[in-house]
Design a protein with these regions (language model features):
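Metal/cofactor-centered catalytic core regions of large enzymes
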Residues: 1-231
Length: 231
């Protein structure tokens, strides 16, 4: 039921439940509407009781603890050797979160805690993920407050060389049409460079490694997927 409500929020924001393709270089494809804000506020009110009920069922459940405590324990050294990241790495006691060590998207402006385990067993992995849901609620609440303070209609950076102009401008403005053509036809040249950027995904570090040789398409693009490494 709660997951369905989250899908409704996604659909209200970007028009799709799963393929949430709203992000663009320097911002978003469109601004959030009033209904989306209302749904997010409702979610912030209705989800904490669900989490508390969830905790009552598992956190102090003797059967659950006996089946998870001490099971499949992994040391910090082993986790690092495996290349783990995200919640399962932090469950071993390694305090590493991309949002804190290499902040992006204004994460340095948010106040939240990074839950860290001690034994690296199944119970600690569960507890880390459980606490991260609480921290996510804190981040969402702060982000919502910051967005509401921003000027209305400002949802992307002014970078016409890389950001597709609105369709209505393409049909009526020659400059917008030129930028649209350059981006779509791949006529935006970029310098020779090599870059790696990562974000903190739900399952760990999601990285993007890009090599460019100066042409109009990447020489090499590789995705560092956390699930592939973790499992």
């Amino acid at each position: 039921q709660e997951r369905e409500f989250i899908y409704e929020i996604f659909e209200e924001i970007c028009g799709a439940r799963l393929t949430t393709n709203i992000g663009r270089i320097g911002g978003f494809e469109r601004d959030f509407n009033a209904v989306a804000f209302e749904k997010i506020r409702e979610f912030l009110k209705r989800y904490p009781p669900v989490l508390k009920e969830f905790e009552e069922m598992f956190v102090r459940n003797r059967i659950f603890i006996e089946r998870t405590s001490g099971v499949a324990a992994v040391t910090p050294e082993e986790a690092l050797d495996y290349g783990w990241s995200g919640p399962i790495l932090r469950a071993t006691g390694v305090d590493y979160d991309v949002r804190v060590q290499n902040p992006y998207c204004s994460y340095e402006e948010f106040d939240f805690d990074v839950p860290v385990g001690a034994t690296g067993d199944v119970y600690d992995r569960f507890m880390v993920r459980n606490e991260e849901m609480w921290q996510s609620l804190r981040i969402i609440e702060q982000a919502l407050e910051k967005i509401e303070k921003e000027p209305k209609g400002v949802f992307h950076a002014e970078v016409p060389d890389f950001y597709l102009p609105p369709k209505e401008q393409v049909y009526t403005n020659m400059e917008a049409l030129i930028y649209h053509f350059k981006i779509v036809m791949g006529e935006v040249d970029t310098p020779k460079a090599e870059v790696y950027h990562a974000v903190e995904g739900a399952n760990g570090e999601l990285g993007f490694y890009l090599i460019h040789d100066g042409g109009r398409s990447p020489y090499r693009l590789h995705f560092r997927r956390p699930s592939f490494v973790n499992y």
